[in-house]
UniProtKB/Swiss-Prot annotation:
UniProt-recorded Gene Ontology molecular function terms: structural constituent of ribosome
InterPro entries with a match to the protein in the record: Ribosomal_uS2 (IPR001865), Ribosomal_uS2_bac/mit/plastid (IPR005706), Ribosomal_uS2_CS (IPR018130), Ribosomal_uS2_flav_dom_sf (IPR023591)
Record flagged with keyword Ribonucleoprotein: yes
UniProt-recorded name of the protein: Small ribosomal subunit protein uS2
Region (Disordered): 246-272
Alphabetical list of HAMAP family matching this protein: Ribosomal_uS2_B
One Gene Ontology biological process: translation
Amino acid sequence: MGSIPEFSIRDLMEAGVHLGHKAGRWNPAMAPYIYGVHRYKDIHIIDLRKTAVLLRNALSVLYDVVHRRGRVLFVGTKVQASNVIAEEAARCGQYYVNHRWLGGMLTNWETVSSSIRRLLDFEKLLNDTDAKFTKKELLMFDKKREKLERSLGGIREMGGLPHILFVIDTNKEHIAIQEANKLKIPVVAVLDTNSDPRGVDYPIPGNDDSIRSIDFFCRAVSNTILEAIRSDLMSSGISVAGSVGQAKDGSVVDSGKGKSIAAHKGGGKASKGAAEVVAGGSVVSASGGEDAVVQE
């Protein structure tokens, strides 16, 4: 097995992964993952030692799924997650829902597939220079295409149900998790201190509101997937001389050869002033920054 991305407790803290919600807004089911309460801000602090272990476990599971050529569906429709979910899923040649989860997106896949075919039909029609339609008709077709693209664009090429979900914000995406549970599709999810961990097979305790934190988790997942693809290609006898990246058309490529590997789909340095965990388990900041905590 290839390696999953390396990270440290310091990396997690610099990304703000440890910062939870106000103590009064917590979900008691998250108690095992909470380190303490910020003495000045009254927010829960997530135990990054547990986050590190569980993140590595989740990344290992994702690696194994992709190495076996399984499909990963990134799900994150909140404003803070929408862009990075789409960017990182595309970067590693996987799939995403970042606008709105449509009920039945998994459990009624046949209907969703039909809608995807309609999207492709609209695109073909709008690109047909010989088509005889009025401007009004073309505008109507384009509006329908845009609506379908917004909802289904990230899964248009998925070709079947995903083999695993990666979710940001389990409270907001509870319907997606319920559908995955019903179909016995495993779920990897970032869980904040107010999250409901039920239905999550591979929890990752962490801040699911901060853009920095969301970006950290999405990049870790994307990099893991790219490493799994690289390893699978090499084990299949395909030379991967350069880094694995994304071509302009969205396919994953070997940048050393420029060779598309889209067929695989489906089938920093730490700053000196950053806070860190020290002896005794207390979290302190060398810079005295606002993230500093002392747990008595």
